[in-house]
Each structure stands twice: as structure tokens, then as C-alpha cells.
Amino acid sequence: MKSEQLKIPQATAKRLPLYYRFIESLHAAGKQRVSSTELSQAVKVDSATIRRDFSYFGALGKKGYGYNVQYLLSFFRETLDQDERTNVILVGVGNLGTALLQYNFSKNNNTVITHAFDVDEKKIGTKVGEVPVYNWDKLEEIGLQNVSIAVLTVPASQAQKSADRLVKAGIEGILNFTPVRLSVPAHIRVHHIDLAVELQALVYFLKHYPL
Ligand SMILES: NC(=O)c1ccc[n+]([C@@H]2O[C@H](COP(=O)([O-])OP(=O)(O)OC[C@H]3O[C@@H](n4cnc5c(N)ncnc54)[C@H](O)[C@@H]3O)[C@@H](O)[C@H]2O)c1
């Protein structure tokens, strides 16, 4: 994502893929313009936030007209590097890893899982969907050309040492599905997806902030 270069707030950067997905569907449906209210209802972000987010990229919308869908689409595609393919690896082809490999990410964007790794002899050498499973012990031998992101779906007990090895191999970003809070050098970005925490948060919000 080029948002670092644009110096936009991280919260805005995180919403960009959400906007992009919706704008892409509008474009596919032949829609030519969209208002911030329509956008707001679709992506469930209030329209003032949308206008502020968009203002970081310059005046993209016109009062009473809304936003030009084609313009937004090319703008987001470029900002999110959608014209460039991003190669990703996945480590740990168990229940969760298999489900992620079977989900076709590239249908919606240009992110492709090219390699999967595991230690289980029964899985090494097989394919899940289109993705070949390699021997994790051979990571360095196989090498990671043009790969900067890893999805981590190993058991918790293996998480930290797997992350250490990924960092040594040159990975810059880890999408961590394990419950472990990873320690990594400052230049490595970790995004943590903890379903238990998300569920707990939802329970809390339902109780304390009823809609
Ligand atoms: N299954 C879920 O719904 C779920 C949901 C949220 C989070 N998680 C977390 O995701 C992780 C994986 O969960 P799961 O249910 O898929 O587990 P799993 O036991 O089914 O799969 C783990 C896989 O990792 C492999 N593995 C073990 N050590 C490895 C290593 N050092 N290097 C590479 N591969 C290795 C195993 O052979 C296995 O294939 C866990 O940390 C779990 O807490 C799972």
C-alpha cells in the first residue's frame, strides 16, 4: 500500500480496502457516481469519516454530485497497489490454514498465496487448492523471491520460533492468526487476527452499546 508515502492516518489506511471493494462492485454494476451517504450505508462508516478520509487524497467529490466511480476505482487501485501482484506464503496447513488456502483471495484482489509450508510429512508435497505445500525445514533452501508477507497459522507453541525464522528469511509483514503476541524487530509489521478477542468485544458492545 502506498498510503505510507501519502502520510495518511493508519485508521484511514485500514478503511481503504473496504472502500475499494464496494467501489469495485459499483463499477461492475455500471454505476457512474456514488454519494458519501450511499457509501456510508454500504460500508457502515459514517459519512463525515468518509469525507475526511477522502479529503486526504485531495478533493475527490463534488457537492450535490458525489464521487465519480471510475475515478475512485483507478485512484484506489493505484493507492492500494492493485495493479501489482502481492505474493504471500502461509505457514501451518492445519484446519485454519487449509480453510484460508481454499479461499480464493485473488478473486477480489491481487494478493496470491504462492507457497504453503508445514512440518507434517503427509502434507508436504501435496496441494491445497492451487497452492503447493512445502517442507518448512527447507524454507531457506526454497527461498522467498518477491514474497514479503506471511500468514501464520501454526499451533501457538510454534508461533514465536516460526516468526523468528520468517523474519530471518526476509518477511516484512505477518498476518498472525495464532493467539501469541509475537516479538519482532521494529521494522516488521504484525497484524493480529484473534477471533476470541473479536467475539468478546462483540459481546461487550452488544451489552453496553445497544443500537
Ligand atoms: N481453527 C480455528 O478455527 C482457529 C481460529 C482462530 C485461531 N486459530 C489459531 O490458528 C492456529 C492454527 O490452528 P488450527 O486449528 O489450524 O491448528 P492445526 O493443529 O489444525 O494446524 C496446525 C498446522 O501447523 C503445522 N505445524 C506445526 N508446527 C509447525 C511448524 N513449526 N512449522 C510449520 N507448520 C507447523 C501442523 O502440522 C498443522 O498442519 C492456532 O494457533 C490456533 O490457535 C485457529
Curated annotation (Swiss-Prot):
GO terms for biological process: negative regulation of DNA-templated transcription; response to redox state. SUPFAM superfamilies: NAD(P)-binding Rossmann-fold domains, Winged helix' DNA-binding domain. It is found in: Cytoplasm. GO terms for cellular component: cytoplasm. Its main location: cytoplasm. One of its GO terms (molecular function) is DNA binding. Keywords: Cytoplasm, DNA-binding, NAD, Repressor, Transcription, Transcription regulation. InterPro entries: CoA-bd (IPR003781), NAD(P)-bd_dom_sf (IPR036291), Rex_DNA-bd_C_dom (IPR009718), Tscrpt_rep_Rex (IPR022876), WH-like_DNA-bd_sf (IPR036388), WH_DNA-bd_sf (IPR036390). Residues 18-57 bind DNA. SMART domains: CoA_binding. NAD(+) binds at G92, V93, G94, N95, L96, G97. It comes from the Bacteria. Pfam families: CoA_binding, Put_DNA-bind_N. Belongs to the transcriptional regulatory Rex family. Modulates transcription in response to changes in cellular NADH/NAD(+) redox state. Homodimer. This is Redox-sensing transcriptional repressor Rex. The lineage of its organism: Bacteria, Bacillati, Bacillota, Bacilli, Bacillales.
